[in-house]
Amino acid sequence: MDQLAHHFSEHIVELNRRVAEIIAREKLSGLVIHSGQHHRQFLDDMNYPFKVNPQFKAWVPVIDNPNCWLIVNGRDKPTLVFYRPVDFWHKVSDVPDAFWTEHVDIKLLTKADRVAEFLPKDITNWAYLGEHLDVADVLGFTSRNPDAVMNYLHYHRASKTQYELECMRQANKIAVKGHQAAKNAFYNGGSEFEIQQQYLSSVGQTVNEVPYGNIVALNQNAAILHYTALEHTKPAQRLSFLLDAGANFHGYASDITRTYAFEKNSFCDLISALNAVELAIIDRIKPGVKYTDLHIETHHHIAQLLLDFNLATGDAAGLVDQGITNVFFPHGLGHMLGLQVHDMGGYLHDERGTHIPAPEAHPYLRCTRTLEANQVLTIEPGLYIIDSLLDELKQDSRKQQINWDQVAHFRPFGGIRIEDNVIVHQDRNENMTREFGLID
């Protein structure tokens, strides 16, 4: 924790530097950042689970308390207006006293609608950052989520501070424990629901605390890219298991995927081959490399796997050029990772918001930036048997290059995805996921 405290001091200095630069450029007095508010369920008296504004948790690891505010101007100590109502219905958050509190000026707010008393007297030249524009209107903000400010913050968010990197290491360390427990639950005969419970118990987080809905997929369910159904019934035959699950630490996410075969067979060999592809692509990561180039290179590796495992015929370059690899690997290679699972800034060329579009042939790629030191990325190649995409392919001449008997052989296994979280350093890569022990 001492190391976190040391890094947090530097983190706040860097965030203040960024704010000072952008508000000077945009002639603003400062930023007022709203943690967010509860959303009430329609025709009900219950709220949806609260999700904090990522711009807010960049400054303080307060991720579960609505109606909080930050007042920052890049010069003075940030002011945290911390919501602490008098409430006998709900648990009221304790006044923070952790390592980071010495770096902010904490003021307590007991009634959410009295926040104006804590804001600058004249907010004409202050920008509101947050989701609730109706609240911003009531408070009198005329500058709300200005594009120039948001683009600047999102662009620079890709460059992680040492504090952020340490938080993400801890998020990986926690998630690795969950993955190991889930793997054991799979081999011990657990259902998807039971495996999920083992994972959550091991990471010590609820379904609303982990950074995204876990994908716990047995057998053919692994072909559904964002499968979250969680069947309670155990399958009659246990073939494969895909787990895409992360953990949260101080508001920072990990995002890890592994795939397992229940028995030693050709699907197990395919997993090993894709694992080798993933590691080869990670070895290619270094500052100056375009993420788009890594994605396209991965498609050539996938093409070779299709040939090696007799799923397709022809040559690797042709399979890529004809879009056949897109049928088996339809998503992007990965994305930026941080305060959000799909962290902001992945398409930005510069701090003014110049957009770098994904290649026309690869529209689902979530990152098109040139890599730099201190960025954190996921690398997650996949290979799936997705019937809806294969049905489209059957409509044209490309169907002749597919070995449909081999497709049928692999269909019950669903698919494979392998995903690690990687820090780009100037002279090396740091594969956090593997370094914490999730080797396979």
UniProtKB/Swiss-Prot annotation:
Reactions catalysed, as given in the entry: Xaa-L-Pro dipeptide + H2O = an L-alpha-amino acid + L-proline
Q: Which GO terms describe its cellular component?
A: cytosol
Known cofactor(s):
Mn(2+)
GO molecular function list: aminopeptidase activity; metal ion binding; metalloexopeptidase activity; phosphoric triester hydrolase activity; proline dipeptidase activity
Coiled-coil residues are none
The UniProt note on the cofactor reads as follows: Binds 2 manganese ions per subunit.
Entry keyword set = Dipeptidase, Hydrolase, Manganese, Metal-binding, Metalloprotease, Protease
Q: What is its EC number?
A: 3.4.13.9
According to the UniProt record, what class of enzyme is this? hydrolase
Instruction: List this protein's GO terms for biological process.
Output: proteolysis
InterPro entries, per database record: Creatin/AminoP/Spt16_N, Creatinase/aminopeptidase-like, PepQ_N, Pept_M24, Peptidase_M24B_aminopep-P_CS, X-Pro_dipept-like, X_Pro_dipept
| Residues bound to Mn(2+) 2 | D244, D255, E419
Its annotated function is as follows: Splits dipeptides with a prolyl residue in the C-terminal position.
Q: Which HAMAP family match?
A: X_Pro_dipeptid
What family does the Swiss-Prot or TrEMBL record give for this protein? Answer: Belongs to the peptidase M24B family. Bacterial-type prolidase subfamily.
Q: What is this protein called?
A: Xaa-Pro dipeptidase
> Could you read off the lineage of the organism from its UniProt record?
Bacteria, Pseudomonadati, Pseudomonadota, Gammaproteobacteria, Alteromonadales
Please name the gene that encodes this protein. pepQ
